[in-house]
Amino acid sequence: MFAVFHKLDNLIAMTDWNGKQIDGPLEEVSGIGDLSAKWEAWGWNVIVADGHDFDSILKAFELAKAGKGSDKPTMILFKTEMGHGVDFMAGTHKYHGSVPKPEQLEDALKQLGETPLGDF
């Protein structure tokens, strides 16, 4: 509200919108609804981008910078999937507040094309 009231059009905020909370899917836990519509109702410019696509991310920042002069702050909502790229983590909230077992970590790193970094 402060940013809108003071017309902070040079302010760019970001949210990782993965649809999950630590204890379950967002709609089952808090029923937040359309996050984009909420930010717009609060007076912000809203840009929705694919948080897994570098081109989409860069385009979102370009659009946000172009919003200067609009007298509105900008919120970029990055739509993501928790655990994206790792079959046993993708789409579940179970790893929101926990760590994988050592053998799971090794598997996850392989799936992401990374090399093991040693003991954790």
Please give the residue ranges for each predicted region:
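Glycine-rich ThDP/TPP pyrophosphate-binding loop and its adjacent helix/strand module
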Residues: 1-120
